[in-house]
Amino acid sequence: MALPEFSMRQLLEAGVHFGHQSHRWNPKMADYIFGARNNIHIIDLAQTVPLLHRALQAVSDTVAKGGRILFVGTKRQAQDGVADAAKRSAQYFVNSRWLGGTLTNWKTISGSIKRLRHLDEVLSSGDANAYTKKERLTLQRERDKLDRSLGGIKDMGGLPDLIFVIDTNKEDIAIQEAQRLNIPVAAIVDTNCDPKGITYLVPGNDDAGRAISLYCDLIARAAIDGISRAQGDSGIDIGASVQPVQEELPAAAQPAGFQGLAGPRGVADDLKKLTGVSGEIEKKFNDLGIFHYWQLAEFDHETAHKIGEEVGLPSRADGWVAQAKALTAEAE
């Protein structure tokens, strides 16, 4: 794996260079503005390119050191891209309303996350039958409300090590909380925004859907590169197995979509290297016949989600697949 590459042409095609109307500008962004056309400020992509590369390097370095990245984008056009990118790169996200104190009052937020986990457990088990239809509906509504706000961070387990923000004006509370806790901020900063306090500033259009999709994709790939680097630094050699192939489980006993094994093929991979996988979760993987990264790397979304449900962490499934692919590619 390597840091994701991009070109100025890609930025142009995505509309990254289009700022806001010239009368809506923030004078503090003057250094990053190339000029104006039809009363629309044009962002200087000659500066955006190296600054975006710097932000990608920061994301990769943070993840390579075992850090967590929090994607923040609550505006409508950013919600899906932020969630997809975070899941694909085994990171975390907030794409609904930012709850004040999400970072600075983590203890209270953790309590809400515990409540969300409890509701998930109750509603997905037979315990739900003990409630009346009206009570179940009330619990479901509470669960859905919590999931919208906290679903993307319920597995984070602590404060992030870096946050990536789309639209610094809209996410100003998130940025203030990060600054108060000395958490680095990488952000897309448009011509109507204040660049002050942004650790890794990237001048660019924060409204166009194509531009936002490009940013999210690049940040996700940088995070995956960091995962790959972390595994490489740990000295894991996935291709070192020289022992005979073990007998596979009968096909009828295997969930569709992956190859279950009766035992590891040679030395089993340390599945605890995957984000959120404890010794207990690793044992559940093994009970399902999963011992190696290459098995996880072959999962499609549906199969990954089913396996995630089997081991009790369905929200992490896509992230595990991304990590497994990175590890497998590193070994090759």
Swiss-Prot record:
Q: Which organism is it from?
A: Nitrobacter hamburgensis (strain DSM 10229 / NCIMB 13809 / X14)
The answer to whether keyword Nucleotide-binding applies is: no
Q: Which family does it belong to?
A: Belongs to the universal ribosomal protein uS2 family.
- Alphabetically list the UniProt keywords: Ribonucleoprotein, Ribosomal protein
Name of this protein: Small ribosomal subunit protein uS2
- One family name in Pfam for this protein: Ribosomal_S2
What HAMAP family does the entry give?
Ribosomal_uS2_B
The source's superkingdom equals Bacteria
